[in-house]
């Protein structure tokens, strides 16, 4: 067919005289509004967090967890209440990211979706509440003695747990320690990647960073001697373990340590020491959740609220002791039972095979009421498979001879860096009409941005 026009249009001329936004809306970068709220209840706790375009964690066949050697696409620091609001510019093709932080009391890593309005939001309290509501509908009601446990273990009065291992006798309020204690615990259990003489990467953990804790150069005891009567709580901090471990305690006269496991009464504190945001499967706990321990009086055969002077508290961990949903349900054990798993580990070294040190206990000198305890469940000896702290109701109730918790010289760095790399491709006839092959000049680049954190 033939149509008529008032005048012939010069489409080439129109494009040259139009703003490029009118006909060229292609963009390789998107601006995303970022709102992060870790919902910390105490002030003065700032955390550094990263955003990745892939899961930054890898899991090996032996169950160990390690950080991938990759750069984040964004990095920032929260305010003193764990909040951050800002804008990040990232590649336009990214629709999902991973929020990651190695600071204690943060859920990490988490897969998040950028919404249609290019916003990325995270509220840790809401996230944890949603996780618990999802798991609650899948578990049975909790009744006394519903779950079985090994004959070596004993249960506190009125204690029980659900199918995820969440105890029923948790204290009603979260007990997160002061910010400086959290920074110090993170610092001492940190992992640092360094290059050896051959150029190969090597991960340094507490075993290498503090050899004096392990080589006998100082008096190291992981058991907790009580020198003044006090109530004692065990508070969950974090776990980097792939295993589902059970943690408990025992007591003995300080001047008469046990010679074998048959000499102690193992009492369950936390059936499953996995965080609720555990990547593999479902966990049970969040940082600051607390169990009040009780002293078993052998003479009266009763539990008491206070631990007397002259007794020592020891720790035991049942490796892979909690029967989780990921474990095959074809055998006689039910989900939520305490099973033999990979066997027991003790803080009293002579109870372990080859006298192996399985825990590290470090006293916070400033408070006089806090001791950080790290457990090693397997073979990497980072002592971060279950991290707790002990809180006593009385100051200076614990033997001051315990090694001191090292202080973090730089809890939050004054500056932090993030590196970007990529390829720039140029068209030499732009914006004129050309072949648009974008290969007239190609440049690979790496840039590092430094920001003030404070």
What are these model-predicted stretches?
Residues 2-8:
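Bacterial signal peptide processing site
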Residues 8-454:
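Extracellular distal adhesion/interaction modules in secreted or cell-surface proteins
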């Amino acid at each position: 067919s033939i149509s008529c026009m008032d005048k012939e249009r010069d489409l080439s001329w129109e494009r040259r005289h139009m703003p490029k936004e009118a006909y060229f809306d292609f963009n390789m970068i998107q601006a995303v509004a970022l709102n992060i709220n870790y919902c910390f209840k105490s002030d003065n706790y700032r955390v550094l967090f990263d955003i990745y375009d892939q899961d930054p964690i890898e899991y090996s066949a032996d169950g160990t967890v390690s950080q991938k050697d990759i750069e984040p696409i964004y990095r920032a620091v929260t305010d003193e209440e764990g909040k951050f609001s800002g804008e990040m510019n990232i590649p336009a093709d990214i629709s999902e990211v991973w929020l990651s932080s190695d600071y204690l009391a943060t859920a990490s890593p988490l897969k998040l979706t950028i919404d249609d309005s290019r916003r990325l939001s995270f509220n840790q309290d809401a996230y944890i509440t949603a996780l618990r509501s999802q798991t609650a509908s899948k578990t049975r009601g909790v009744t006394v003695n519903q779950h079985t446990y090994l004959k070596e273990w004993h249960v506190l009065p009125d204690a029980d747990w659900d199918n995820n291992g969440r105890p029923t006798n948790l204290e009603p309020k979260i007990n997160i320690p002061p910010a400086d204690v959290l920074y110090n615990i993170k610092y001492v259990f940190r992992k640092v990647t360094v290059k050896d003489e051959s150029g190969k990467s090597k991960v340094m953990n507490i075993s290498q960073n503090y050899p004096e804790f392990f080589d006998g150069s100082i008096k190291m005891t992981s058991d907790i001697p009580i020198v003044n009567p006090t109530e004692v709580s065990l508070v969950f901090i974090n776990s980097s373990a792939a295993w589902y471990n059970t943690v408990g305690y025992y007591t003995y006269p300080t001047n008469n340590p046990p010679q074998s496991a048959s000499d102690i009464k193992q009492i369950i504190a936390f059936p499953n020491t996995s965080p609720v945001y555990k990547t593999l499967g479902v966990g049970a706990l969040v940082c600051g959740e607390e169990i009040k321990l009780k002293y078993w009086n052998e003479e009266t055969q009763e539990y008491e609220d206070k631990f007397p002077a002259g007794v020592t508290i020891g720790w035991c961990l049942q490796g892979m002791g909690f029967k989780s949903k990921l474990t095959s349900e074809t055998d006689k054990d039910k989900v939520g039972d305490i099973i033999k798993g990979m066997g027991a580990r003790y803080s009293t070294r002579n109870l372990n095979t080859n006298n192996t040190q399985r825990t590290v206990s470090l006293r916070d000198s400033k408070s006089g009421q806090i001791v950080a305890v790290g457990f090693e469940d397997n073979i990497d000896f980072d002592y971060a498979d279950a991290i707790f702290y002990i809180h006593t109701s009385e100051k200076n109730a614990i033997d001051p001879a315990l090694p001191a918790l090292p202080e973090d010289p730089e809890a939050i760095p004054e500056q932090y860096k993030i590196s970007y790399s990529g390829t720039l491709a140029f068209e030499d006839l732009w914006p004129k009409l050309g072949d648009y092959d974008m290969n007239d000049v190609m440049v690979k680049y790496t840039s590092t941005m430094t920001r003030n954190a404070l």
